[in-house]
């Protein structure tokens, strides 16, 4: 679920996702189009693509099972669809952490008008 995704991002980055990522670049937050603007925006693009491949459950609403072991998230549970959502969220949270040093505030509250280029395929 989006609440679990928020939790993962906060634990991985120490940042509040609603302020730091919800309105960043062309792909972070609702929707997405154009060309990812930087590495952080690409994390969101890849996450959107990952959600797009999930069938049989709702990535934004369905609650999955995960645990933390030695600072890493481990996706669990018996439902393969929910496990897939968890993996999408986990990989995006890791991506955000890995790209913290290139986060650029100029892409925060980025205007959709700047995202007019043709979108690349997933």
Swiss-Prot record:
One of its GO terms (biological process) is negative regulation of T cell proliferation. Signal peptide: none annotated. SUPFAM superfamilies: Phospholipase A2, PLA2. Binds 1 Ca(2+) ion. The keyword Hydrolase applies. GO terms for molecular function: calcium ion binding; calcium-dependent phospholipase A2 activity; phospholipid binding. It catalyses: a 1,2-diacyl-sn-glycero-3-phosphocholine + H2O = a 1-acyl-sn-glycero-3-phosphocholine + a fatty acid + H(+). The active site is at residues 47, 89. Pfam families: Phospholip_A2_1 (PF00068). Disulfide bonds join 26-115, 28-44, 43-95, 49-122, 50-88, 57-81, 75-86. Keywords: Calcium, Disulfide bond, Hydrolase, Lipid degradation, Lipid metabolism, Metal-binding, Secreted. One of its GO terms (cellular component) is extracellular region. Expressed by the venom gland. It is an enzyme of class 3 (hydrolase). Belongs to the phospholipase A2 family. Group II subfamily. D49 sub-subfamily. Acidic phospholipase A2 (PLA2) that only causes a mild edema, when subcutaneously injected in the mice foot. PLA2 catalyzes the calcium-dependent hydrolysis of the 2-acyl groups in 3-sn-phosphoglycerides. Is not myotoxic or lethal. Lacks anti-coagulant, platelet aggregating or anti-aggregating activities. Monomer. This is Acidic phospholipase A2 BlatPLA2. It comes from Bothriechis lateralis (Side-striped palm pitviper).
